[in-house]
Amino acid sequence: MDVTFTPLDPAGADRDALVALLTENAWPFHTRPRVTRPEAEKAVDGGAWEDEDHRTFWIEHPEHGRVGVVRLEDLTDPTPLFDLRVAERFRGRGLGAQILTALTRRVFETMPAVDRFEGQTREDNVPMLRTFRRAGWVKEAHYRRGWPVDGGEPLASVAYAMLRQDWASGTTTPVPADVDAPPPAGRKEGAAAGGRAPDWPLPTARLTLRPHREDDFGWLQEMYTQPEVVRHL
């Protein structure tokens, strides 16, 4: 059985349970690691968890039961985002990719206007970074010092996304290489300032160098999601 999502009523029957979840758990990778009861009640009563732009669901796991909540954000935009919160006692069990895969399917199946689904996390949230990759999402941006940290220096905010066409076809549209301004007249694209562009492939004493090709993306993604590689990234 798959992970399912139950619509949540923050202003009614589910208010107390939502406030309890927010205040009884630590959220070390969110902007506010600890949420006080007055803060939670103010946000819930102010519509932060259910309005035109937000919709919230309980996360129902077939083995563990209700494990947390997920809030869809920017629903009036063709690229919504999400806020995933799993209760502390269910973390570290590898549930993230299951949840995100099921959530992606729900969004694309029930929201025909959505063309891409996006999420962001801070650079030190290794479990969430792994979750994105294992769910087949593609890294699109790395915003340096873009994530405010309560009482500390800002960290980078890392953005991942899933395209509807990739979800539907089971393929991956890679992010293109950096594209700068066209090279000056008389110099080939890719050439160093003081010389000509190398002739690819470029043999060396021990190996042959060549640019990445589009068909390299699959094995590169697999390599960079291996635990022994991820911990050094």
Describe each region flagged by the PLM.
Residues 1-25, 56-232:
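Acyl-donor (CoA/ACP) binding surface of acyl/acetyltransferases
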Residues 26-46, 228-233:
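Conserved GNAT-fold acetyl-CoA-binding loop/helix
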Residues 47-52:
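Short loop/turn motifs at secondary-structure junctions and domain boundaries
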